[in-house]
Swiss-Prot record:
InterPro entries: THAP1/10, THAP_Znf, THAP_Znf_sf. Its main location: nucleus. Keywords: Cell cycle, Coiled coil, DNA-binding, Metal-binding, Nucleus, Transcription, Transcription regulation, Zinc, Zinc-finger. This is THAP domain-containing protein 1 A. It comes from Xenopus laevis (African clawed frog).
């Protein structure tokens, strides 16, 4: 019985004049044999003791160099299959052919109306319209941001005015406090010397147990206690 390759689409047969070797499925090693079966990718394929795969489906590192590349290593698995490469290439070609070429956008050229001698607005294609719509969204966002910035600036101005008014109130209160402190200090000095200052036109001066009315022209009088 002439040995032939069990790989799908491979027509290699044993020929002593060709440098092709054939390798039996490792039936005694089930795990490795399953890998060979999966690599062959043949539906409902069950290898027998006569099934083999030719050396064309093994990479160079799968062979033992000391045996002139005739014996496989213990963990060698076939990985080279021409039909798989053809399918990949054909699949890529079909995908490229199926994809229609995108038309290049043609810039709109303004036309001149011969009747009035003015430039007419350019005609927009659907792609131009899509771009314009996107630009409108951007413009709306920009307008919204400007309004928001304007509102924030107005709030800042209001807060500055409130802060200014509060500072003015604080300064007035400080001046009032300083005035009261001066009056208290003057009162203490006057009390220490035996004199008391009263406003004119409202009080009478006590002098040697006798009351006398103050004239309207007198603003302040000193009384000896």
């Amino acid at each position: 019985m002439v040995q032939s390759c069990s790989a799908y689409g491979c027509k290699n047969r044993y020929d002593k004049d060709k440098p092709i070797s054939f390798h039996k499925f490792p039936l005694k090693r089930p795990l490795l044999c399953k890998k060979w079966e999966a690599a062959v990718r043949r539906a409902e394929f069950k290898p027998t003791k006569y099934s083999s795969i030719c050396s064309d489906h093994f990479s160079a590192d799968c062979f033992k160099r000391e045996c002139n590349n005739k014996l496989l290593k213990d963990n060698a698995v076939p990985t080279i299959f021409a039909h798989m490469e053809i399918k990949k290439k054909s699949g890529k070609a079909v995908k490229k052919e199926q994809l229609p070429a995108e038309p290049e956008p043609v810039p709109a050229v303004p036309e001149i109306d011969p009747a009035i001698g003015l430039l007419l607005p350019p005609l927009y294609t659907p792609s131009h319209i899509a771009v314009i719509c996107d630009h409108n969204y951007t413009v709306e966002d920009t307008v919204h941001q400007r309004r928001r910035i304007q509102q924030l600036e107005e709030q800042v101005d209001k807060l500055r005015k409130k802060l200014k008014i509060a500072n003015q109130k604080c300064r007035r209160q400080e001046r009032s406090l300083e005035k009261l402190e001066r009056e208290v200090s003057e009162y203490r000095e006057a009390k220490g010397s035996g004199y008391v200052i009263f406003p004119g036109n409202y009080y009478e001066v006590l002098n040697e147990n006798e009351y006398k009315e103050l004239t309207p022209e007198i603003t302040y009088k000193e009384i000896i206690l």
